[in-house]
Amino acid sequence: MARKWMRLLIASLAVILLAGCSSLEEQTIDGLENAKVAFQDDAEKPNEKVNDMNIFLPSGFSIEEESDETNIILSKGKDSFILFINPNELPSSQLYYDLMTSDSNLEVLDEKTFEQNGRFGFAAIIENSEEKYELITSIGGIKLTTISEQQDIANNLENMMLIVRSISTN
């Protein structure tokens, strides 16, 4: 009888552990959908200021001191995020998307483009190493990148698009 309970307990724990670990495919699908929703929703109200620019930073994000006007380094815990701002590009610009898709050295696992109200945006997941992925979110001349672990892809893409969406350059 004790053996049956032990097997049931082990089987239950295995199911719980497996359910808690999302696959790369699930993280990718959820992350791209999260980025799409963040792109289409109203921009978050800015809660930080960098130079002359207002920006929304989700909880836990901070601005690093060595940032300048066009390259802003953000951090959340041990993760770094680099925000590139090209003020010469309009919100409809596809510059960063075209650069990514023309680079044959990149192994793009999945990407999705978005268009709304004269804005062009995209989110992409690029293989960086066996267990790390480069994430990109962009709208026009604003691009945010990070290196992410698999289990953080969906959450990072959502937060990244919320940040990018909150910035107005033109």
Place the predicted regions along the sequence by residue.
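Bacterial N-terminal signal peptides that target proteins for export
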Residues: 2-9
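C-terminal motif of bacterial Sec signal peptides marking the signal peptidase cleavage site
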Residues: 16-20
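Bacterial signal peptide processing site
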Residues: 22-25
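N-terminal "mature-domain start" segment
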Residues: 28-66
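Short, hydrophobic/aromatic-rich segments at coil-to-beta transitions
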Residues: 40-46, 69-72, 115-124
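Secretory pathway targeting signatures of secreted, lumenal, and periplasmic proteins
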Residues: 50-97
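Signature of long, low-cysteine stretches enriched in small and polar/charged residues
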Residues: 103-151
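Surface-exposed amphipathic alpha-helical segments
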Residues: 144-170
